[in-house]
A protein has these predicted regions:
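Glycine- and acidic
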Residues: 106, 132-133, 246-248, 256-258
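N-terminal alpha-helical segment
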Residues: 25, 243-244
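Structural detector for internal amphipathic alpha-helices that build alpha-solenoid repeat scaffolds
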Residues: 225-239, 249, 257-269, 276-280, ...
Length: 286
């Protein structure tokens, strides 16, 4: 995460409800070494994420909450899946200060899910399920008693997603709290809370569809775009003499997430080396 951000807003803040004085950066995801000594915030700007997962490409996805007090307001943000890219700010702020989807410095959602209470998240890669489920994420909604499968499709160096109902209970008595894939390839999930009965369930696939993993994409234009973005992300977190030369040409990329990674790489460099270059830049995207 760059060090030059602040909890600032140009427009008047309409404060109401609980968390009305919540401060940036909101929720965040941290990477740390096994001994806990080296810690680094990777991505931020969430409301209340309980869980996240990594897909087969090693990309991070965060299931973030909505704010119930905002429902019906122009700045309401539904629960959603966010791509947790390095240096990313997903723009959640208290009350009306939320960053709009069209802001150039926010990371948009991969797929909006809707009102709910996000809990557990797991990638399906180790499940003994049909192939299309092994490439999916599984997310739990406590409030509406539903587990969704999220099917990701590459979109440049990022993804877009499709949500599909995987399991649900129409009477609401399936308050999902967490989900795992066991070493046997079956899915296990638990429910409970707020005075409700707790249960542990197992889901086993017994059909005839193939359960083989699909071939991992390493050669497509999307895979190459992800590699470019990751190269730029390698400059995040510290000054590097090569960063400006590599990143500057990508500031005008048609790929939003590559532009984003390039900008963060440059923000980690001393402005005295690039401020004048920024003033003279002619590319509107850059």
């Amino acid at each position: 995460i760059p060090t030059n951000w602040k909890d600032d807003v140009l427009l008047e803040n309409y404060a109401y409800g609980h968390m009305s004085q919540g401060k940036a950066p909101g929720g965040w995801v941290m990477k740390m070494s096994p001994d806990g000594k080296n810690r680094e915030i990777i991505t931020m700007g969430f409301r209340n994420p309980c869980d996240f997962a990594l897909n087969r490409d090693g990309e991070l996805f965060v299931y973030d909450a909505d704010m119930e007090y905002d429902i019906g307001s122009p700045w309401y943000r539904p629960t959603r899946i966010n791509h947790g890219i390095s240096g990313g700010d997903s723009g959640w702020r208290a009350t009306s200060k939320k960053w709009r989807e069209y802001f150039p410095d926010t990371v948009g959602s991969v797929v909006d899910v809707g009102p709910g209470s996000p809990t557990g998240v797991i990638a399906g890669m180790n499940a003994r399920f049909p192939t299309h489920y092994r490439d999916a994420l599984f997310i739990c909604d406590w409030t509406f008693a539903t587990m969704y499968s999220i099917h990701l499709k590459p979109n440049g160096s990022s993804y877009i997603g499709e949500k599909r109902e995987f399991i649900s209970n129409s009477d609401g008595s399936l308050a999902l709290t967490d989900v795992v894939i066991g070493p046997d390839g079956n899915m296990y999930f638990c429910v409970g809370g707020r005075g409700g009965q707790s249960y542990l369930y197992r889901i086993t696939y017994t059909g005839s569809e193939s359960t083989e993993l699909s071939q991992l994409d390493t050669t497509s234009e999307h895979a190459k775009a992800r590699a470019t973005r990751r190269k730029l992300e390698s400059f995040h977190g510290s000054a590097n003499g090569e960063a400006l030369g590599v990143a500057w040409t990508h500031l005008g990329s048609e790929d939003y997430h590559i532009r984003y990674a390039a900008r963060i790489a440059i923000e980690w460099q001393n402005p005295k080396f690039w401020a004048q270059k920024a003033y003279s830049e002619k590319n509107d995207l850059a």
